[in-house]
Amino acid sequence: LRLVERLLARGEVVAMTGDGVNDAPALKKVHVGVAMGKAGTAVAVEASDLVLLDDNFATIVTAIRLGRGVFANVQKFIAFLFSGNVGVVLAMFIGTILAGIFNLRVGVELLLPLTAAQILWMNLVTDGAPAVAFSLTRAQKDVMLDPPRRPDSPILSRSMWAYVFLTGGTVCALLLMVLDATYQGGWFTVHDHDYHYARTAGFYTVVTARLFNALNFRQLPQSFLVTGFWRDLAVPVACLVSWGMTLAAIYFAPLRELFHLVPLDFEHLVLFTGLGCAVLLPGWAFLRFRGVQMSR
């Protein structure tokens, strides 16, 4: 018990195994008390946090590996959601300011980059399936080689936040660029369309960019380009499902009317899909030359 108290005083994360009545005080005091399920006394089992049903110490190592994998998936899940939402929030903020400066209006209302219903679609459908798929991703093979993370370390490290804002800023830039290129009142108009078409083009580009962005976060801290893409397909499959549902929202009349969308020309669909994958480039470059600390 004195040894446990000394380790706790040093700020260590302490786990202890025990099976006897005399182990109960220490099992109760440590962060994680582990009791033997077969040989352990009822008092030790009651005082512990975990019970080894097979009395095999190797099970503890397996539990730590799985726990680290779960924590890493939570980090990726949170960072992925922040990245997509940062891009849309920035685009809405900048787009609203520009619409006010240049008096871009629909009737008496400012012309916004996206509608509330379209943003809701992105949060529930575009990000929903990939975010759930992150929980199914297996831990990296080298997850046990990392040192224990500090208890007071944040969930997202500084480098992770930089990665979030870089990829989110790219999503923002893609949305504003497509809106300007397709709207008849834009600065550098390439395809002269009304605001309905331009907004649909921007909506589709952001959706594809956010889905490709899931690949940026899928195997952090490594790039998906240098690791086994086919090792774990939960996230890619979820992205394909979300992409298919988005196509249905654009080309299926009832959904299209609900979300104020119009059909896109096929060549534009291909073009905007290609633009969406541009979010992969800054993500790869950041991981290649700067790197992300997962702060385990």
Predicted segments with their positions:
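Membrane-embedded transport module
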Residues: 1-15, 35-221
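Cytosolic catalytic headpiece
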Residues: 1-22, 28-29, 74, 108, ...
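Proline-centered helix-kink/hinge sites
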Residues: 25, 130, 253-254
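Structural signature of FAD isoalloxazine-binding scaffolds in flavoprotein oxidoreductases
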Residues: 26-28, 45-46
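C-terminal transmembrane module of polytopic membrane proteins
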Residues: 204-296
